Structures are given as C-alpha cells and as structure tokens.
From Swiss-Prot:
EC number in record: 1.7.1.13
Broadest EC class assigned to this enzyme: oxidoreductase
Biological pathway: tRNA modification; tRNA-queuosine biosynthesis
Function statement: Catalyzes the NADPH-dependent reduction of 7-cyano-7-deazaguanine (preQ0) to 7-aminomethyl-7-deazaguanine (preQ1).
Main location: cytoplasm
Entry-linked SUPFAM superfamilies: Tetrahydrobiopterin biosynthesis enzymes-like
UniProt binding sites for substrate: I63, E64, L65, H82, E83
Source species of the chain: Sulfurovum sp. (strain NBC37-1)
Name the record gives this protein: NADPH-dependent 7-cyano-7-deazaguanine reductase
Amino acid sequence: MKYGEKEIQEFDINAEENFWPNEHEKNYTINIELPEFMCLCPRSGYPDFAIMKLSYVPDKKVIELKALKLYINSFMYRHISHENSANEIFDALYSQLEPKSMKLIADFNPRGNVHTVIEIDSETF
C-alpha cells in the first residue's frame, strides 16, 4: 500500500486537528471547489465522478484544507449513492464546523444520460 492510500484509509474527519480556530469576527464566505470527487455506484460498482462545491460562513472553526481533501478522497472506493454521499459529507462537515451557514453542491458527471446535481443548504432547514 502506498503512503497516500494509507493516509486516506486511516483518515478520521472527526479528529480535532482537522479544524482550526476562526481568527476573524466578521462574516466572510469560504468557497471551496473539489473537482475530483469519486465514489462507486452501490448497485453496479461503476465509478461516479462529481465536482463538489462547498460554501460556508464560519463561526468558531474552519476546516484544514488537506483534511478536507483526504476526507473527500476517502469516498473513492465506497459503494454509495449520489444522495447519500452528498448528505454524509454535508452532515459530517456541518456537525464539526457548526458554521453560521453552509451549502454543498454535488454536481455528478452524467452517466447513462442522467445528470444529477444534489444541493444541500443550511438556510433551508
């Protein structure tokens, strides 16, 4: 096993070192695009690819970017649906960051003539 595979396999999104203190009191938005998301279809095992777009207004914490990359890469060999992967990512990040607001857009590549976009927005809760 290569060192990168090991790091991804052993990654824990809930580890304290993955989140840093937000040193600013003013409201500002962090926009992050993750263009290489991959998971496996739970039915066929075929790969699904997506661009994940995360946008949040931090409160007390921000996510360390390498941690976010490792977390997203941890889905690479998981059999999980579009809806479940987007919701799992949103829920994990939202519960750890406790942001003032957060939105995740999971824009999956078309497969079988179907293009899926999942949007989850804390403003709609």
